[in-house]
Every structure is written in structure tokens, then in C-alpha cells.
């Protein structure tokens, strides 16, 4: 088996079919390299209640639906999907991604020609065609203050921390190795997964991709951005309205990441955790007030 696709769904009925149809069309399209892919697809459903699984089973019967029995989080669902498949390459995918023609074959060709590439990722576009800055530098202590969505980044868009983190001094139009890429769409080599281990299930959602890519890089596998392959990401469509749990889990993931990769003195760890969760509580409060 050349390729296994693992799609994790949660309340994804409105977008999953566009994702799967673009996937199916892209894989069955003619590959200029003349190398057809033997492939399989599993949809790991995290207890959707909106008819996601029924739509997939009716409209895309070639995809195997696995019901996880609860909302396990992204990392745990991905790991179960990887364990249930056998492809040499594993495409981890959000259900709100729609592939451009030729993109999947371009990623597979990159992996064939770069034997030490552990993860290859496409250029991810927003629905309006602009680039989603999905290839980034490792986060540091200032990242949670100056990340893509923070108020400080909006007030000071050209700040040096955002430029470093989002790699804004690079045009994102040429291939290169990077620190990490978004888990919304990433093609991983099973041999690399076997070497470094699966995603860390201590991350419920968010930051598991940063950690996985970091472990790949540290083990000598490259993480490569391949802009020839492109996908449109209808970001947030698989999450629905942002819940307080999503906000809290994102910030808990930040704390786990920093404790795992940036351990300092206990007082500094506690201070960093306090500041991160204070930000989370502020966002929860704003979420409740509808702001």
C-alpha cells in the first residue's frame, strides 16, 4: 500500500464530502511521473452528532469510517488511524481541506525523491486564495503573545516575534525545510513515524503537530514545505463555533509543549503556565460576552 489517508472528523458534515471528493479526484488523476498510487482512506470520527458518518458512508463508501466512541482529541484519533492503516506514506488531514489538482501526487513525488524527509506539507491557502502561514519556526516564550490571532499581533502586525514565528521574510513560494508545519494537511513517512513514535496524546488538540515535527527534526528527518502542492483550508469549519473547551485545550497544549521542550526553573515554569492560562481565561470571558 503506497498511501493511507487519515481524516479526523468532528461535526464535519458540511465539509467532509468536498474534502473526500477532491482527495479521490486528485489521487485518480493522471500523475505526470507515471506512478499510480495504491491507497486507502479512513475517517476517524470523534463522536459527531450531525450526521457526518452517515453522509460519508452513503456518499463515499470507499472511505472506511471508524467511530472512536467519544471525542478523543486530534492526536489520539490520528494515532488510531495510523495504527489501522498500512500505507508507506500517511496523509493526516483535516476534513475542511480541499485539494488542488496534482497536489497529492506532487507531495508523494517529493517524498520519493527525498528519502530523509519525514513530513512533507502542501502550501495551505485560505478560501480567498491568500497564503495561510502554515510553515513556521518553533514557538518561543513570546509566541503566545504574538501569534497569528493575538490582539498584540493585530495592533503591531510587523513585530519581530511574529515575523520570526510565521517566517514572514520568506515568500512561501519556494520549497524549503522548516521547523514545523500545520497538522491540517501533512504527509508523513511511516518509517519516520516508527522511528520517532506517534503523536503525543497528551495534546488534546493543537500543538501536537509542533511537537511531532520537532521530534522528527531532532531524529534527523526533515520537515519540508512543498508549495507546488496546494490545498484550500476552510479553517475552523471542522470545529464549528469556538467553544470554551477548545480555547482551554489550545492553551493547555502550549503549557505541555513548553514544559516538554523548554523546561526552565520551576518558578519560571509556573509563571509561564500562569500567564498562558490567564490569557485563556480572558479569551473564555470574551467568548461568553460574544466579543
Protein language model features and the residues they cover:
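Conserved donor NDP-sugar-binding/catalytic core segment of glycosyltransferases
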Residues: 98-134
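Active-site-adjacent helix/loop segment of glycosyltransferases
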Residues: 211-291
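Short, well-formed alpha-helical segments that are part of the catalytic scaffolds
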Residues: 12-31
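Short, flexible, basic/aromatic active-site loop/helix in glycosyltransferases
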Residues: 139-178
